[in-house]
């Protein structure tokens, strides 16, 4: 694995990330969510994608792709490991979302190319990174109140908003993926959060991928 080549690719791709709002449909009518996990000791990569209707946020469609993992886990290069399965799930969708939430980082990455940015550029769709852990940068401690927010800064540059979506829960790191500004990204994540820590698009993607009770109940209702 030639990390120098991958690092150079990241820097080149990151220079082409669009950090301004360029949504084709605004406001979006279909919002997607994506979540990636690994099975069989990391041998299989699993990507789940969901489509939600906006503004109702009802689940319209889901797809789950499982493919052999092609790259080992290397910190800072996770997007290269995850995007093949995401691309497979993306191609399985009957229609494409106007905006995609990705469980992971966008530009809040040491080389400004997390999976939300990498995948957004691959398929040229507006994406938002919604991460549960900090990868780089610093931020001022948040109050315990829901809605508390602080900028994530690195080398004088704001990379994300750190936002506490729910009381007594760790905050989320919301960043530009591609074709969505950092402030617009936070606004959409706030609008799509309904009482849980995660916004509905990535919450549903996780529920589908993991077979959580909310998804099983949805399947029962659908018959």
Curated annotation (Swiss-Prot):
Keyword Cytoplasm recorded: yes
Keyword set, alphabetical order: Cytoplasm, DNA damage, DNA repair, Endonuclease, Hydrolase, Magnesium, Metal-binding, Nuclease
Cellular compartments per GO CC: cytoplasm
Primary enzyme class: hydrolase
Gene3D superfamilies in the cross-refs: archaeoglobus fulgidus dsm 4304 superfamily
CDD domains in alphabetical order: Endonuclease_V (cd06559)
Interaction with target DNA, annotated site positions: 73
Pfam families per UniProt: Endonuclease_5 (PF04493)
Catalysis: reaction(s): Endonucleolytic cleavage at apurinic or apyrimidinic sites to products with a 5'-phosphate
Gene Ontology biological process terms in this record: DNA repair
Cell location: Cytoplasm
EC number: 3.1.21.7
GO function terms (MF aspect): deoxyribonuclease V activity; magnesium ion binding; RNA endonuclease activity, producing 5'-phosphomonoesters; single-stranded RNA binding
Cofactor: Mg(2+)
Residues bound to Mg(2+): 35, 103
InterPro entries tied to this protein: Endonuclease-V
Record-linked PANTHER family: ENDONUCLEASE V
Free-text function comment from the UniProt entry: DNA repair enzyme involved in the repair of deaminated bases. Selectively cleaves double-stranded DNA at the second phosphodiester bond 3' to a deoxyinosine leaving behind the intact lesion on the nicked DNA.
Protein name: Endonuclease V
Protein source organism: Cronobacter sakazakii (strain ATCC BAA-894) (Enterobacter sakazakii)
Encoding gene, per UniProt annotation: nfi
């Amino acid at each position: 694995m030639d990390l120098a080549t991958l690092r150079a690719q990241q820097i080149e791709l990151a220079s082409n990330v669009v950090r301004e709002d360029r949504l084709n449909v605004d406001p979006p009518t279909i919002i997607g969510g994506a979540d990636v996990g690994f099975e069989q000791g990391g041998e299989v990569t699993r990507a789940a994608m969901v489509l939600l209707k906006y503004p109702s946020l009802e689940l319209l469609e889901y797809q789950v792709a499982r493919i052999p993992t092609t790259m080992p886990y290397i910190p800072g290069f996770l997007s290269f490991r995850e995007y093949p399965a995401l691309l497979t799930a993306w191609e399985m969708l009957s229609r494409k979302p106007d905006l995609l939430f990705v469980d992971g980082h966008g530009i809040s990455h040491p080389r400004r190319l997390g999976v939300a940015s990498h995948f957004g550029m691959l398929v040229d769709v507006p994406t938002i990174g919604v991460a549960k852990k900090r990868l780089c940068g610093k931020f001022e401690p948040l109050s315990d109140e829901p809605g508390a927010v602080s900028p994530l800064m690195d080398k004088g540059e704001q990379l994300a908003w750190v936002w506490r979506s729910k009381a007594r829960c760790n905050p989320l790191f919301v960043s530009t993926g591609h074709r969505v500004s950092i402030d617009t990204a936070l606004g959409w994540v706030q609008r799509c959060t309904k009482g849980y820590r995660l916004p509905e698009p990535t919450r549903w993607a996780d529920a589908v991928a993991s077979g959580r009770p909310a998804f099983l109940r949805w399947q029962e209702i659908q018959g």
